[in-house]
């Protein structure tokens, strides 16, 4: 029984660790993407023009 009990304990932590990593990445990336999508094109183009002018 001990030999059968070891693999689940080894697999368990990995299965528990992976989802939080994915959710943490999504929690950071999704709001940013939604915020960028919510911005009007004029704001984005103005930001690019300002960045280009500063680069010059």
Curated annotation (Swiss-Prot):
Residues with PTM Phosphothreonine: 45
UniProt keyword list: Allergen, Disulfide bond, Phosphoprotein, Seed storage protein, Storage protein
This protein's record includes keyword Phosphoprotein: yes
GO molecular function: nutrient reservoir activity
Family: Belongs to the 11S seed storage protein (globulins) family.
Function text: This is a seed storage protein.
Subunit architecture: Hexamer; each subunit is composed of an acidic and a basic chain derived from a single precursor and linked by a disulfide bond.
Protein name per Swiss-Prot or TrEMBL: Cruciferin
Species: Sinapis alba
């Amino acid at each position: 029984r001990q030999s059968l009990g070891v693999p689940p304990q080894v697999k368990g932590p990995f299965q528990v660790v992976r989802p939080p990593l994915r959710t943490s990445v999504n929690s950071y990336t999704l709001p940013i993407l939604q915020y960028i999508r919510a911005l009007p094109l004029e704001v984005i183009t103005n930001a690019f023009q300002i960045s280009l002018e500063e680069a010059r």
